[in-house]
């Protein structure tokens, strides 16, 4: 496993994290086994924006005994009071959901408490007006929340929220399709998305990556916006090469999936090389750096790491 340091918090975070969007489908036994295999493999960062509330007791069972060794990214606005995911900006609803989540996780603190899914600036205004942000900041003041984060798909909204509030982590959708305006959540121009990476890097805000495979589209030539398939390892490397990125959070629901993704660290450079996207990227990508490092040192003077 490889780790990167969050410059604002000092946390040492695994570059491969654990996404939970569909883990509930696996059932408790398989889910717990997958989570424990991830932990054994060095994964220490877990996102808890999941489709089903029953995911939380799985994590309580799997990681309750080693809670101090892992980081939970928990979303203030993801409502599980009905048993399944719902989005809410109501402070009281969020309070009930968070208290339930903590009980199921067998913990009394949250490493990263996230302002959840703010895709329009009006969402942020509603989040403040309805008491959600007040509740989050109160939990931070009480020490229940250690650090505050923001999740969004929209670069222009991210910029405006970051102008108003200090956060230590940003959850952002990162993959070559979205970066070149291809896909359902491909929001913002190439330059707007690049500006987010650069701002986060400059200000020490860590980026945790959601949707690294564009919901599986990039892995299937038949539905890829490029007409060709990428591998999971190529997509992970692409995301890790963006400025500011600390960890990539693919969804996992089985031991086999976890082991395959952990195989990234034993893969050859050729297996992780995504430089070929330059041969089939959309027209708007022409002339834009994709940080593949193959022209290093950059003839245009871009810092490509």
Residue ranges and their predicted role:
Residues 21-23, 49-51, 75-79, 115-118, ...:
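Active-site beta-loop-alpha junctions enriched in small/polar residues
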Residues 69-73, 166-175, 269-275:
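Short hydrophobic/aromatic-enriched beta-strand-loop microsegments
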């Amino acid at each position: 496993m490889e780790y990167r340091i969050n410059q604002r918090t000092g946390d040492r975070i695994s570059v491969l994290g654990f996404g939970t969007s569909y883990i509930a489908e696996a059932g408790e036994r398989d889910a717990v086994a997958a989570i424990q295999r991830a932990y054994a493999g060095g994964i220490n960062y877990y996102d808890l924006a999941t489709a089903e509330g029953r995911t939380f007791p799985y994590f309580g069972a799997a990681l309750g005994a080693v809670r101090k060794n892992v980081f939970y990214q928990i979303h203030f606005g993801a409502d599980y009071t009905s048993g399944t995911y719902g989005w809410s900006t109501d402070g009281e609803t969020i309070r009930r959901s968070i208290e339930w989540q903590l009980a199921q996780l067998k913990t009394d603190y949250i490493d990263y408490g996230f302002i959840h899914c703010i895709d329009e600036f009006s969402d942020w205004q509603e989040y403040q007006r309805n008491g959600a942000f007040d509740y989050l900041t109160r939990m931070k003041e009480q020490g229940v929340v250690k650090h505050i984060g923001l999740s969004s798909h929209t670069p222009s909204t991210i910029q405006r929220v970051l102008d108003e509030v200090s956060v230590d982590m940003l959850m952002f959708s990162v993959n070559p399709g979205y970066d070149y305006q291809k896909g359902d959540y491909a929001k913002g121009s190439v330059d707007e998305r690049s500006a987010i990476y650069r701002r986060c890097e400059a200000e020490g805000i860590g980026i945790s990556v959601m949707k690294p495979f564009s919901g599986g589209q990039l892995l299937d030539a038949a539905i890829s916006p490029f007409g060709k398939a990428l591998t999971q390892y190529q997509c992970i490397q692409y995301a890790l090469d963006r400025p500011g990125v600390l960890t990539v959070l693919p969804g996992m629901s089985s031991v086999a999936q976890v082991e395959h993704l952990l195989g990234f660290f034993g893969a050859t450079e050729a297996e992780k090389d995504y430089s070929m996207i330059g041969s089939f990227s959309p027209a708007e990508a022409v002339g834009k750096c994709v940080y593949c490092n193959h022209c290093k040192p950059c003839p245009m003077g871009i810092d490509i790491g």
